[in-house]
C-alpha cells in the first residue's frame, strides 16, 4: 500500500510539473508570436529547471548565433575549473648583475602576467620596491618581459573602428590602467582654454588642447586621439560648457607601461634613461625584488559584473598556458585549444560544432548555440568549487553591474543573476533565477538582427518575469 501511495504521489508531482511546463510554453510562445520586435529579428531561448533536472522550454536553442558578451560565461566557467579559484595574476620585478653604491650594474626586469587590474598605485609600489632594493641608477637595460603572449594585440574579428574606445584596449601582459588614460575636461574663464587633467601622469602621451571655455561657437566638445595613425596625442577641441570625462585607449600598452615606469622612476630621483627600455625575456636566474599579486576572483568580478573585455581576455590568455605544449608566446589559437578541450571533456559538447575565437565575445567570428551556453551554466551549478564564485560575480538585477538599470521592479528585482551581452545587432542574457516554487532556473536568451538593443532587453526582462512565475 505504501509503495502504491508513493507512486501516486510521484505521478501527482509529475502531473503538476507537466502542467506548469505547458503553461510556460504557452505563455512564451504567445510572447514570441506577438512581440513586434520579432517581425524583423530573431530570438532563441532555452530554459532548464536545475532543481528538477528537467528542460522546461526551448526555441531555436540549437541554432548558431553570435553570443556577444555572454561568451564570458564560457571563459569564466572554464577559468574557474581549469585555473582554480585560488589562481593569482602576477607582475614580478627582478634584476641581474650587482648593485654597487646605488648603481645597478645589470638589468632591471618587469615580467608581465597579464594583470588587467594593474593600476597607477601598483606601479608606485614597483617604484618603491626598486628604491628599497637600494637601486638609485641603472647602467644596463630596463626590460619589459611580455613573453607570456604573442604580438597580436587584438582578437580575430575585432572591429578596427572600435578604437580608441576603452572597451577595446591593445592587449599585452603588461597593462597599466587597463591600457587607457582617464581624461577630465573642465571649463575655465570664458574664452580661455578648458582645463584638461589626464591620469595616469606620463610622458608617453601628448596633449593638444584646442578647447574654448563657455564659447558655443567653438562647436561640440570632442575628446579623442590620433588613432588612425596609431598616435598618442590626446586632442581636445570645441566648447567646454561643463565638466566632461572620457577614457581612451592608448596605442601599444606594453610601451605605455614601461615608459610610464621609467618616468616615475626618474620622478622619484632615480637615474634611468628611456633609451634603456627593451622588451626581452627575463632569465630564470634573476634576483627577485617584488611581486604584485591579483586574485582571480577580482578579475572575474569585473569581467562578469561590468562585462569587461580586458579582464575576460586576460583569463583567456592564462588558460592558453594550459595548452600542454608551451607556456610563453601564447596565441589566441593556444587559448582556443584549452577552451575546446574543456568543452569536449567536461561540458560534453563537440567544439567542432561551434566557433569561439576570443574570451570576451567581442569578435564577430564567434558562433555558439544557446544550448551550449546553458550547458556551461548547468555545469557550474553542479560543481560547488566553481558555482559560488561564478554566481557571486554575476550582475544582480536592479542592483549592480550591467543589470543595475534593468528589472528594478517586480519579482525579477534582486532575483535574476545573469550575464548580459551587446554588440551591434546582438543582445543576449544568460544566467539564473529562482521561481516562486523555489526552484533554481538556468536560462539563455539571444536576440539577433536587432537594431535597437533596448527593445531586445525589454523582451528579455519580460521573459525573466514569466520564468519567475513558474509554479
Predicted regions and their residues:
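Beta-lactamase-like hydrolase cores
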Residues: 20-64, 124, 129-133
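Short Pro/Gly-enriched beta-strand edge/turn motifs at strand-loop
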Residues: 27-29, 203-212, 410-417
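Bacterial Sec-dependent N-terminal signal peptides
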Residues: 1-23
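Small-residue-rich helix-loop
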Residues: 56-58, 306, 316-471
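Conserved serine DD-peptidase/penicillin-binding transpeptidase domain
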Residues: 34, 82-351, 469-470
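Short active-site loop at a secondary-structure junction
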Residues: 58-78, 82
Amino acid at each position: 500500500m505504501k509503495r502504491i501511495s508513493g507512486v501516486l504521489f510521484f505521478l501527482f508531482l509529475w502531473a503538476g510539473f507537466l502542467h506548469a511546463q505547458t503553461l510556460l510554453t504557452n505563455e512564451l510562445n504567445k510572447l514570441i508570436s506577438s512581440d513586434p520586435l520579432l517581425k524583423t529579428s530573431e530570438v532563441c531561448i532555452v530554459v532548464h529547471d536545475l532543481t528538477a533536472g528537467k528542460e522546461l522550454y526551448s526555441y531555436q536553442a540549437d541554432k548558431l548565433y553570435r553570443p556577444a558578451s555572454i561568451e564570458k560565461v564560457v571563459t569564466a566557467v572554464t577559468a574557474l575549473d581549469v585555473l582554480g579559484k585560488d589562481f593569482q595574476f602576477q607582475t614580478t620585478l627582478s634584476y641581474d648583475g650587482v648593485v654597487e653604491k646605488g648603481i645597478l650594474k645589470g638589468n632591471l626586469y618587469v615580467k608581465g602576467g597579464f594583470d588587467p587590474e594593474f593600476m597607477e598605485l601598483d606601479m608606485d609600489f614597483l617604484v618603491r620596491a626598486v628604491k628599497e632594493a637600494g637601486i638609485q641608477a641603472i647602467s644596463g637595460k630596463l626590460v619589459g618581459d611580455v613573453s607570456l603572449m604573442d604580438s597580436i594585440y587584438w582578437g580575430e574579428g575585432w572591429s578596427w573602428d572600435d578604437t580608441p574606445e576603452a572597451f577595446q584596449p591593445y592587449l599585452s601582459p603588461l597593462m597599466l590602467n587597463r591600457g587607457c588614460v582617464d581624461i577630465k575636461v573642465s571649463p575655465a574663464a570664458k574664452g580661455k582654454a578648458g582645463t584638461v587633467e589626464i591620469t595616469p601622469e606620463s610622458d608617453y602621451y601628448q596633449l593638444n588642447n584646442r578647447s574654448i571655455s563657455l564659447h558655443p561657437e567653438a562647436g561640440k566638445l570632442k575628446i579623442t586621439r590620433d588613432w588612425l595613425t596609431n598616435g598618442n596625442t590626446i586632442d581636445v577641441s570645441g566648447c567646454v560648457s561643463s565638466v566632461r570625462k572620457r577614457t581612451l585607449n592608448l596605442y601599444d600598452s606594453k610601451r605605455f607601461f614601461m615608459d610610464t615606469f621609467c618616468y616615475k622612476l626618474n620622478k622619484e630621483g632615480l637615474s634611468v634613461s628611456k633609451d634603456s627600455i627593451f622588451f626581452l625575456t627575463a632569465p630564470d636566474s634573476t634576483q627577485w625584488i617584488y611581486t604584485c599579486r591579483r586574485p582571480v576572483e577580482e578579475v572575474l568580478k569585473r569581467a562578469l559584473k561590468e562585462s569587461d573585455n580586458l579582464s575576460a581576455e586576460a583569463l583567456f590568455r592564462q588558460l592558453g598556458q594550459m595548452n600542454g605544449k608551451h607556456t610563453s608566446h601564447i596565441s589566441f589559437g593556444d587559448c582556443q585549444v584549452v577552451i575546446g578541450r574543456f568543452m569536449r571533456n567536461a561540458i560534453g559538447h563537440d567544439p567542432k560544432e561551434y566557433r569561439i575565437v576570443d574570451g570576451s565575445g567581442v569578435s564577430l567570428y564567434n558562433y555558439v548555440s544557446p544550448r551550449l551556453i546553458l550547458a556551461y551554466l548547468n555545469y557550474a551549478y553542479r560543481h560547488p568549487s566553481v558555482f559560488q564564485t561564478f554566481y557571486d560575480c554575476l550582475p544582480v538585477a536592479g542592483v549592480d553591474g550591467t543589470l543595475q538599470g534593468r528589472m528594478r521592479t517586480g519579482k525579477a528585482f534582486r532575483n535574476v543573476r545573469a550575464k548580459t551581452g551587446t554588440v551591434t545587432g546582438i543582445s543576449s542574457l544568460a544566467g539564473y533565477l529562482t521561481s516562486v516554487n523555489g526552484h533554481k532556473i538556468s536560462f539563455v536568451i539571444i536576440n539577433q538582427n536587432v537594431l535597437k538593443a533596448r527593445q531586445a532587453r525589454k523582451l528579455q526582462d519580460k521573459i525573466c518575469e514569466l520564468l519567475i512565475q513558474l509554479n
